[in-house]
Swiss-Prot record:
Cellular component, GO, one term: plasma membrane
Keyword Ribonucleoprotein: no
Gene from which the chain derives: ctaB
Pathway: Porphyrin-containing compound metabolism; heme O biosynthesis; heme O from protoheme: step 1/1
Protein family (similarity comment): Belongs to the UbiA prenyltransferase family. Protoheme IX farnesyltransferase subfamily.
Full protein name: Protoheme IX farnesyltransferase
Amino acid sequence: MAGVIMAQSLTHDAMTLPADWRDLLALTKPRVMSLVVFTALCGLLAAPGDVHPVLGFSSILAIALGAGASGALNQWYEAGLDARMKRTAGRPLPAGRLDPQTALQFGIGLAAFSLFLMLFASNWQATVLLAGSILFYVVIYTMWLKPRTPQNIVIGGAAGAFPPLIGWVAATGSIAPLPVLLFLLIFLWTPPHFWALALFVRSDYAAAGIPMMPVVAGEKSTRRQILFYALIMAAAAIAPWPLGYTGALYGWTAILLSAIFVLLSVQVGIRTTAEDDRMQPEKRLFAFSIAYLFILFGAVVADHWWPL
């Protein structure tokens, strides 16, 4: 409830302002949404069988809208926390450009429409998974895990791991081993990705009172855990090839990219920081982790359509 109360305190200026489409778009976290959409699309394209282009597009649009709804409801609930962090203070709600009621209505409306569209375009199984991912991100991660435990990213990573599974189920109506492995890959990728970010914005999280791992356990422990998760993530990334679910194109891509990821994680894991440190290794790992997922999921599709 603290997030809601703080969000309501921001309305004194914003209540008089009309909603701008750019602010509504910002609520959906477009950069995060782009990765969600891409991994969902890869899950759909890697699935067996043919999907009608219109229904396939509608399913991916539904996933995008669901991700946008999750982002909007997250920002509505965390407006007060965002106002205390330099990185997020310019967002529409803490900056006073949008009132919380509009953000809440927008998020709920977007979520409802995304579920209706998914049900119309694909099947009830994909719709249930999409609803579960929205609820998990908003309720389990945002409202419960994030303000309470440094394991918020570890457990909450499941929310961001749903898209390829939803894309696959939208195309087939059933779950198979490959999308489950892709779910596991994103789940294990999430801690080193976000903890690399948390290391170089640690002061922001500390100021907002968010118990991220570097704030609670310290930098040394966080660095060790980044390396640990990078190693098991690499194993999960490579696993589809020896298990027979992908071919050599994906396999060699996964080996090369995972080796780079682990090397960057080693650089982060073994170092100590000084007061004036610019955190360049951490920033390199964070940036590469995004490219890693884009390229690896692209390789899943390429391997499916053009196997070696």
